[in-house]
A protein has these predicted regions:
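Acidic, surface-exposed loops and disordered segments
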Residues: 1-237
Length: 237
C-alpha cells in the first residue's frame, strides 16, 4: 500500500491540540496543496480565511462553541465564493446570475474538495484537524464577523494544530453499502442496524446515541434558519 493511501486510511478527527503554532512555511505548504484540488471549470469558487488571533477564535467560539476552535493553532474558514466570479463576469456582461442551487453546489463542492486536500496535506506534515460544519448554523453572524461580501457564505471550517490526543480510526460503512455496480441499490434497514452496532461497539462507554439516532436528530428537524437567511442576504438565493 502506498504512503498516500496509508495516510488517507489512517485519518481521524483531532479536537484537542497542543499549544504550538504552525510555522508560516508549513501553513503556506498546506494551503497551496489544498489549492491544487479539482474545481468546476477551474473557477476555484471558494476562499479561505485564516484565523490565528486568539481574540478572533474566542469570538468565533462564542457563536460556535466547539473547543477545537479555541485550541487550534489556526482555524481555516472555507467560504463559498462567487464574489470573484461576479467581478470577472462583469468584465464581459452587464448581468450576473449566481444560478441559485447550481451556484451553491458549484461553490460547496469546490470548497469541500479544497478542504479535504488541505486537511490531508496537514496530516502529511504531522498536524491534525477536524472539519466543523456547524459554522453554517451561524451564517449571518459569521458573515458579519468576517466581513463576508455579497455572493459569499461560510461552508465549513477546519481547526488545525499539533495533536494532543489519539483515537482509533472510526469504522466506515461497508464498501458494498456505498459503492454500487452499474445502478443504485436501495439501502436496507438491516444494513443500517448492522452499522449501528459497529459504531456502538467502536464508541464503547462513550456511546450515547446510535448512528441512526444521530441521523434522526439531524434530519428530523427543519433546516437552520440562519443558513437560508444569509444566502438570501448575500444574493445567492
Amino acid at each position: 500500500m502506498s504512503e498516500t493511501i496509508t495516510l488517507m486510511k489512517s485519518h481521524t478527527s483531532v479536537r484537542r491540540f497542543k499549544e504550538e503554532a504552525i510555522p508560516q512555511e508549513d501553513l503556506n505548504t498546506i494551503l497551496s496543496a489544498g489549492q491544487m484540488a479539482s474545481s468546476w471549470k477551474n473557477f476555484q469558487s471558494y476562499s479561505v480565511i485564516v484565523v490565528r488571533s486568539q481574540e478572533k477564535k474566542d469570538a468565533l467560539y462564542e457563536l460556535v462553541p466547539q473547543e477545537a476552535i479555541r485550541q487550534s493553532a489556526a482555524f481555516l474558514l472555507f467560504v463559498g465564493d462567487l464574489n470573484r466570479a461576479e467581478k470577472g463576469a462583469r468584465l464581459h456582461t452587464d448581468t450576473f446570475q449566481p444560478q441559485g442551487v447550481e451556484g451553491l453546489l458549484i461553490t460547496s463542492v469546490d470548497a469541500a474538495l479544497a478542504g479535504q486536500n488541505t486537511l490531508l496535506a496537514a496530516e502529511s506534515l504531522g498536524y491534525g484537524g477536524v472539519i466543523i460544519g456547524l459554522v453554517r448554523y451561524k451564517s449571518v453572524e459569521l458573515a458579519e464577523l468576517f466581513k463576508l461580501p455579497d455572493y459569499t457564505y461560510p461552508v465549513f471550517g477546519i481547526a488545525l494544530g499539533v495533536p494532543n490526543q489519539n483515537h482509533d480510526v472510526k469504522p466506515r460503512l461497508p464498501l458494498e453499502n456505498v459503492v454500487f455496480e452499474e445502478e443504485y441499490q436501495e439501502q436496507t434497514t438491516e444494513a443500517i442496524e448492522a452499522y449501528d452496532r459497529v459504531q456502538t461497539e467502536y464508541a464503547g462507554a462513550r456511546a450515547t446515541t446510535t448512528w441512526s439516532q444521530r441521523l434522526a436528530e439531524q434530519f428530523g428537524q427543519p433546516e437552520p434558519s440562519s443558513t437560508r437567511e444569509n444566502l438570501e442576504q448575500k444574493n445567492l438565493l
